[in-house]
C-alpha cells in the first residue's frame, strides 16, 4: 500500500480517487476482521492470538512512515494518499490490540475515514477543476475565491 496508493491517488481522475479513498483502501482491514470472526467466531478470546508481535509493530511503522512522508509532499493528492497509509496504520493498531475497545475504534474509524476522505477528495476535485493542478503552492489564497470549498477541505482534514 505504501507503494501503489500514492501513485493511484495522484494519477487517477478525481471521481476514481473519491471511490478509491472511500472504499478500496479499507478492504484490507475488513477482510482481516471478516476472516477472524468467520474462522474463530465472535466468542473466541482474541487475546490468545499473538497480533501484538506482528501486526502491532507493522501498524506503528505505517502510522509514522505515512505521517512523516505526508509532511514532505507538495502534491495534495499524494499528501492525502500518505495520510491514508497512516490512517490504515491506526485501524490496524485497533485490530492488533485484540480487545473490544480497539475493535470498536477500528470500525468507527473505518466509517469516519471512508466518509471524510471521500469528502476531502470531492472538495479537492473542485479545486483541481478550478486551478488545473494539485500543488500546495497553487492553493495559496484560495479561501478568498472558494471559501465554501476550502471550508469543506479544512473540516474534512480536521475530522481525520
Show which residues each predicted segment covers:
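Hydrophobic transmembrane alpha-helices and their helix-loop junctions in integral membrane proteins
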Residues: 1-160
